[in-house]
């Protein structure tokens, strides 16, 4: 029995990306990060684009693929305790609208970054590695998989 809870979901983490306005807020947050980085003096535009991409992908990796459990006390017998937020989203159903949005966003940001860095080799390699570290854990084949025992418990 959960006393004092106002939500009707067993695990509120499952539906948070389907909330009204969350996609717009997400894109505006990326834009705000980019504007803040652009306001730093003596930093070139290609470096700002690469930093925007790296910071976005690092935050996405940490919040979606590293942090496990839920901040709420859920009546699911601890099932969510061992799942990352990505694995909890939409009750684990693959290829939902939210999952597609969160998969396509780093790809679009990668294309923009590659264009504005003029496909410079160093920036291209850094951004490609960053993109792959975010996209590979999103694949359905990696649902619940812990490579080398990292983040197992």
From Swiss-Prot:
PTM notes: When hydroxylated at Pro-137, ubiquitinated via 'Lys-48'-linkage, leading to proteasomal degradation. In endothelial cells, ORMDL3 proteasomal degradation is controlled by the sphingosine 1-phosphate receptor signaling pathway.
Transmembrane intervals: 22-42, 43-63, 95-117, 122-142
Pfam families per the UniProt record, alphabetical: ORMDL (PF04061)
Modified residues (Hydroxyproline): 137
GO BP field: ceramide metabolic process; intracellular sphingolipid homeostasis; regulation of ceramide biosynthetic process; sphingolipid biosynthetic process
Cellular compartments annotated: Endoplasmic reticulum membrane
Residues forming coiled coils: none
InterPro entries referenced in this protein's UniProt entry, alphabetically: ORMDL
Entry domain remark: Ceramides bind to ORMDL3 N-terminus and stabilize it in a conformation that physically restricts the accessibility of the substrates to their binding sites in the serine palmitoyltransferase (SPT) complex, hence inhibiting SPT catalytic activity. In the absence of ceramides, the N-terminus is flexible and permits substrate binding, thus liberating SPT from inhibition.
Recorded family membership: Belongs to the ORM family.
Function (record text): Plays an essential role in the homeostatic regulation of sphingolipid de novo biosynthesis by modulating the activity of the serine palmitoyltransferase (SPT) in response to ceramide levels. When complexed to SPT, the binding of ceramides to its N-terminus stabilizes a conformation that block SPT substrate entry, hence preventing SPT catalytic activity. Through this mechanism, maintains ceramide levels at sufficient concentrations for the production of complex sphingolipids, but which prevents the accumulation of ceramides to levels that trigger apoptosis.
Subunit structure: Ceramide-sensitive subunit of the serine palmitoyltransferase (SPT) complex, which is also composed of SPTLC1, SPTLC2/3 and SPTSSA/B.
Protein name: ORM1-like protein 3
Organism of this sequence: Danio rerio (Zebrafish)
Gene: ormdl3
């Amino acid at each position: 029995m959960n006393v004092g809870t106002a939500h009707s979901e067993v695990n509120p983490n499952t539906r948070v990306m389907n909330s009204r306005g969350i996609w717009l807020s997400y894109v505006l947050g990326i834009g705000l990060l980019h504007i803040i980085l652009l306001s730093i003096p003596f930093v070139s535009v290609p470096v700002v684009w690469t930093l925007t991409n790296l910071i976005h992908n690092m935050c996405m990796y940490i919040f979606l693929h590293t942090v496990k459990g839920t901040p709420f006390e859920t009546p699911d017998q601890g099932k969510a305790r061992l799942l990352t937020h990505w694995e909890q989203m939409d009750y684990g159903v693959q290829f939902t609208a939210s999952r597609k949005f969160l998969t396509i966003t780093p790809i679009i940001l990668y294309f923009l970054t590659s264009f504005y860095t003029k496909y410079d080799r160093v920036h291209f390699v850094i951004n490609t590695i960053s993109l792959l570290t975010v996209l590979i854990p999103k694949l359905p084949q990696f649902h619940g998989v812990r490579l080398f025992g990292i983040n197992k418990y």
